[in-house]
């Protein structure tokens, strides 16, 4: 019992001693804090020098000598009060400044943003002077203009085929794919720098179009054949094509149209093609190709575009009587929801098309006019156009939205001029023209919006 009491008394004595020592004539601790609220991001141009003086700090109780430590991308780059750093690489870099004295420290974290040369904007693939050409315009900053020949400028050692065919952006891998013929070549470039990352081993002799297959794949179509490619491995799958025209295929004369209908559900996906030979729509089934959309008597398929409902598509086609029609179809359940003839005659075989993800609207062109048709309006086609773009004689070739569907970008070919490609940008809510640039490309082939 005495031992227990002695131990307890000893503990109290030790605690008492510790408490007493903390107050025996020590100087007050110098506490640090920043004087002002500090920015979280600094934009700096590539190949320039970033200079930043350490922000002012307040030392409470006592002033003591200060030291500095600057980190960029988790590496210490300076111990001076003023940071001087050469920004030679584009990207967003986490930064941290540590200001400290012998008593403590404060930390300031921020992001150094060195923009890539080709960030969010419009990429235009065109034919100019017997070559494939890519033009680009950043759209997030005021005063930007199109830059011509951006692919050739950044990838001079890998030429494209002379006949441009298609351009596609995959946000998941931050890549742009550019396809051309003569010779057939598909390149993958960094979407932010336009520098070649890889030349794909494309196995077919023809290539007319690339079509997005969900987030992770691409359909390649050309010469009546099609493949789908996994973007991660860049391996090709052609089981559907083999079921059509392979050794044991059921339709050896099938000629796959350039427009592919694709739906990707939670647990499964569906791919529908149009065979130009048999004039049939076919879906990949367990026992081979199966006929679908039998109520649609299609002779020429002009467009196949995703509808507002992700399970549906909008088809524009010329039927076997020469009438141009618009059909609304389900892909998940492969049903024809509606089909109506264009009684106003505004749709032509050279029209280009675009569908909205916000509304049940099909945009289509005729010359330099743009019309909008509600494909749930039971065939109520518009009498007049919504937009007149450019000048008399101009011909619209491509239309795209920005991801938020706030702006409409229209690419057209001018009637004359060396560089015929022109781009117009409209506010979708007011239909007001926001800007336009003429002479920015050769003859327009494809246009994309990329983040």
Where are these regions (language model features)?
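Bacterial Sec-dependent N-terminal signal peptides
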Residues: 1-46, 102-116, 122
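Structural motif
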Residues: 129-137, 183-190, 224-237, 268-288, ...
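Repeated scaffold domains used in trafficking and secretory/extracellular systems
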Residues: 154-171, 202-218, 223, 242-269, ...
């Amino acid at each position: 019992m005495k031992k227990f009491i002695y131990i307890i008394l000893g503990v109290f004595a030790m605690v008492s001693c510790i408490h007493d020592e903390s107050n025996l004539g020590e100087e007050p601790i110098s506490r640090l804090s920043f004087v002002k609220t500090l920015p979280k991001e600094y934009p700096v141009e590539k190949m320039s020098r970033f200079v930043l003086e350490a922000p002012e700090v307040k030392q409470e109780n006592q002033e003591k000598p200060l030291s500095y430590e600057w980190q960029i991308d988790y590496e210490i780059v300076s111990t001076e009060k003023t940071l001087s750093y050469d920004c030679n690489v584009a990207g967003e870099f986490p930064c941290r400044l540590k200001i400290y004295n012998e008593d403590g420290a404060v930390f300031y974290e921020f992001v150094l943003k060195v923009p890539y040369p080709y960030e969010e904007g419009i990429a235009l693939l065109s034919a100019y002077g017997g070559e494939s050409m890519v033009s680009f315009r950043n759209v997030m900053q005021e005063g930007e203009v199109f830059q011509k020949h951006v692919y050739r400028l950044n990838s001079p050692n890998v030429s494209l085929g002379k006949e441009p065919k298609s351009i596609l952006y995959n946000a998941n891998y931050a890549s742009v794919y550019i396809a051309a013929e003569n010779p057939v070549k598909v390149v993958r470039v960094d979407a932010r720098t336009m520098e070649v990352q890889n030349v794909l081993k494309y196995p077919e002799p023809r290539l007319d179009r690339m079509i997005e297959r969900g987030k992770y794949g691409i359909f390649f179509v050309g010469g009546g054949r099609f493949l789908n490619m996994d973007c991660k491995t860049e391996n090709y799958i052609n089981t559907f094509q083999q079921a059509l025209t392979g050794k044991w295929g059921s339709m050896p004369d099938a000629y796959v149209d350039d427009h592919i209908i694709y739906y990707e559900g939670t647990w499964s996906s569906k791919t529908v093609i149009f065979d130009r030979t048999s004039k049939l729509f076919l879906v990949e089934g367990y026992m081979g190709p199966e006929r679908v959309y039998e109520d649609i008597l299609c002779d020429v398929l002009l467009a196949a575009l995703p509808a507002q409902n992700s399970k549906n598509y909008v088809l524009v086609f010329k039927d076997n009587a020469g009438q141009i029609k618009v059909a609304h179809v389900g892909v998940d359940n492969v049903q024809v929801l509606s089909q109506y003839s264009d009684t106003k005659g505004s749709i032509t075989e050279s029209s280009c098309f675009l569908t909205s993800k916000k509304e049940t609207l099909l945009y289509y062109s005729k010359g330099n006019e743009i019309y909008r048709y509600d494909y749930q309006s039971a065939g109520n086609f518009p009498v007049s156009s919504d937009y007149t773009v450019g000048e008399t004689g101009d011909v619209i070739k491509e239309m795209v939205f920005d991801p938020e569907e706030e702006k409409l970008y229209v690419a057209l070919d001018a009637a004359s001029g060396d560089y015929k490609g022109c781009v117009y940008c409209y506010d979708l809510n007011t239909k007001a023209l926001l800007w336009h640039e003429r002479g920015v490309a050769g003859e327009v082939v494809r246009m994309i919006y990329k983040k």
